[in-house]
Amino acid sequence: MFVKICGITTEEDGLLAVALGADAVGFVFAPSPRQIAPQRAGEIARRLPPEVLTVGVFRDAAREHVAQTVNSARLRAAQLHGHESAESSQWVSERVPVLIKAFAAGDKGLATARDHGADIVMVDNGSPGSGQVFDWSLAEGAPDGVRLLLAGGLNADNVADAIAAVHPWGVDVSSGVETSPGHKDPRKMRAFIAAARAAAPAPYEGGEEVPYDWQDDLL
């Protein structure tokens, strides 16, 4: 089970998330209590092991800005978390190593996720980072075989049920492992990662365990 910890704002939290077993960390560049400057995100990312997927999160930003920011900060992925068109998403996907395209639960666009050129497809609630849980059956609209990353109100207490209901490729958490917005709780992170891995210890069989070889990308 692929685990992403989003909303990292400090080097300490980034290093700790990875030490506890996170496969990916997210840096929010969109307006948010967890917003971080791209330069600072890049500094933190450079302290992390090369196998970690470092993700810049954007919401309805200009596509040129997305590509330039991700590459300047030397991040490994862009996450588009707004109402980006398939054409804009495709454009970004051709200019960054990995693209994550997020859809709100119930969004009819989820059925056409493949048109966005995304390596990973996320399903979240309509208010990212709010901690609100949505009806997990709404994730069933994702195309078969995509790497589905489930988000939206997950925490150590409900992630096992979410995995059992949706069978995602990975899970994403932010507020569910915090003491306050942007400040991660070590115990909550440990508990969340342990619960997710216990619920689905084996890789998702519908695709590769990870979307590409992080090590090769750095050569």
Where do the language-model regions lie?
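Conserved N-terminal beta1-alpha1 strand-loop-helix module at the mouth
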Residues: M1-L219
